[in-house]
A protein has these predicted regions:
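Active-site/substrate-binding loop(s) of hydrolase catalytic cores
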Residues: 19, 33-37, 41-179
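Soluble metallo-hydrolase cores and metallopeptidase-like ectodomains found primarily
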Residues: 1-22
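Pocket-edge structural micro-motifs
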Residues: 2, 14, 26, 74, ...
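Conserved phosphate/anionic-ligand binding catalytic regions in large, soluble enzymes, centered on
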Residues: 29
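Acidic/histidine-rich, surface-exposed loop or edge segments in extracytoplasmic proteins
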Residues: 24-26, 148
Length: 179
């Protein structure tokens, strides 16, 4: 559906052919990377149940997938997840910049407390709905520049990950969105 700051693809899987649309997203915060694994396990279980024409949680999955299209974006913030899980090169400019940001917040463990994308922007606070209010709250708390968590950014949808997610939701008619 788009690319991260470091140009890593942000993938979305579609399972089902039905007109009703449901969307799941995971790892919008770097320290919520476990959600990606959980969503991929959910995909695996859906596919197995569909192939076997069996039930999952009391629902016949084949029937469900004829009525519903399930979209799953397992990892919205791949750069942040890579930072948190030690996949970024410690000598890279991106890692050094993240370390520089983190040093301003000694109470947030680095990298384990990192929620933001690689630019130090909290992607969950990047959407237009309520952005001005979130900015007011976070700025009053002293979070006015890139940070490991809670920086709203300089304007809504400034970060490519948030913009990709926003545009993707606009191009579909989701009845339910779970993040």
């Amino acid at each position: 559906i788009g690319y991260s700051v470091l140009e890593k693809p942000i993938y979305c899987l579609k399972i089902g052919t039905g007109p009703r649309q449901v969307f799941y997203s995971g790892a919008i915060h770097a320290n919520e990377w476990i959600c990606s694994n959980m969503l991929m396990k959910f995909v695996e279980e859906l596919c197995i149940a569909n192939n076997k024409n069996s039930s999952l949680f009391g629902y016949n999955i084949r029937n469900l997938l004829h009525k519903t299209s399930i979209y799953i974006c397992p990892m919205v913030n791949p750069d942040g997840v890579d930072l948190l899980n030690g996949e970024l090169n410690l000598n890279s400019n991106e890692y050094r910049y993240a370390r520089y940001i983190a040093n301003k917040y000694p109470n947030v463990p680095f990298p384990n407390g990192w929620k933001a994308n690689i630019n130090g922007v909290d992607l969950n606070l990047q959407f237009p709905a309520g952005w001005e209010n979130a900015k007011k709250i976070k700025f009053s708390q002293g979070i006015t520049s890139p940070a490991p968590r809670d920086f709203v950014g300089n304007k809504p949808l400034a970060e490519p990950e948030a913009l990709a997610l926003y545009n993707f939701t606009l191009t579909n008619k989701f009845e339910l969105i779970l993040a």
